[in-house]
UniProtKB/Swiss-Prot annotation:
One of its GO terms (cellular component) is cytosol. The keyword Cell wall biogenesis/degradation does not apply. Nucleotide-binding protein. InterPro entries: DUF520, UPF0234-like_C, UPF0234_N, YajQ-like_sf. HAMAP family: YajQ. This is Nucleotide-binding protein Dde_2479. Keywords: Nucleotide-binding. Belongs to the YajQ family. The lineage of its organism: Bacteria, Pseudomonadati, Thermodesulfobacteriota, Desulfovibrionia, Desulfovibrionales.
Length: 163
């Protein structure tokens, strides 16, 4: 029986490249001279921490992160920006979580959407992915199109198409 998996995976190496590009840009930009703006990426915890001297520089770093994500073909929906918090010496910090995988709630929304479409397919939640099976590949392609048309708050990839 044909099937495919719906996943939401981020390439952490590309995110690391994005952070390194932003670091280089911060080092070379004139408006960041003399400011102690720092970026660090924790691959294990999949989070980016930003430390800037004021809110304006924090917003500029955020815009640079988003622009570099687009440039490196990393979907900006993977980044979950936390609140700006005060740090020592008048600095501000922000934590950015890198979302990886489909949450249980999102997976349930995906399954509900597929079942509401009345297509002859079955959807099952498996850890951080959704497996869709059906008798016809055309039905599976219709499901892919249906899911692409809707926004679930996370970027979706469709892998392991088997017939």
């Amino acid at each position: 029986m044909p099937s495919f998996d719906v996943v939401s995976k981020v390439d952490l190496q590309e995110v690391d490249n994005v952070v390194n590009n932003v670091k280089k840009e911060v080092d070379t930009r004139y408006d960041f001279r003399g400011s102690n703006t720092e970026l660090s990426f924790d691959k294990g915890g999949a989070s980016i921490s930003i430390l800037a001297s004021d809110d304006m520089k924090m917003r500029a770093v955020q815009e640079m992160l988003l622009a570099n994500c687009v440039r490196r073909k990393v979907d900006p929906k993977f980044l979950d920006f936390g609140k700006v918090e005060a740090a020592s010496k008048g600095m501000v910090k922000r934590s950015v979580a890198v979302k990886d995988g489909i949450s249980k709630e999102t997976a349930q929304k995906i399954v509900k959407k597929i079942k509401a479409s009345k297509l002859k397919v079955q959807a099952a939640i498996q850890d951080d992915q959704v497996r869709v099976t059906g008798k016809k590949i055309d039905d599976l392609q219709d499901v892919i199109q249906l899911l692409r048309d809707d926004d679930f708050g996370v970027p979706l990839q469709f892998i392991n198409m088997r017939s």
